[in-house]
Amino acid sequence: MKLSDYVVDFLHEKGIKDAFLLAGGGIMHLLDSIAKSDINKYYNLHEQASAFAADGYGQFANKPALVLATTGPGATNTITGVASAYIDSIPMIVITGQVKRADITKINGVRQTGGQEIDIVSMAKGITKYAKT
């Protein structure tokens, strides 16, 4: 079993029935695992649409939906929808991709070397109950 299979199974067992997402390389293993699951998948053309769809879903169903977005700009595109849900106390789970720790460039002082690095956790901490890498 892959870790991504475990994550998807865990979320499904905890009651996640629906996921809003846009495919991207930073979440490819989760995409493969969710494709095999019983979780309903709603593919959007923009990550912000996924976050707002999950916000609307949470308002209607009173339970969290899952949002999946890839690294860098994919993750930052969810921020407005996440903030909207946070302000209205709407449940939502957002999982974004991240570059490998070995590829993170903060260690060598370079801003970016092509991995679409963004410190999404720092951006999300003020508008979420929990944000972690």
Feature-to-residue mapping (PLM):
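N-terminal alpha/beta PP-like core and its mobile active-site loop of ThDP/TPP-dependent enzymes
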Residues: 1-133
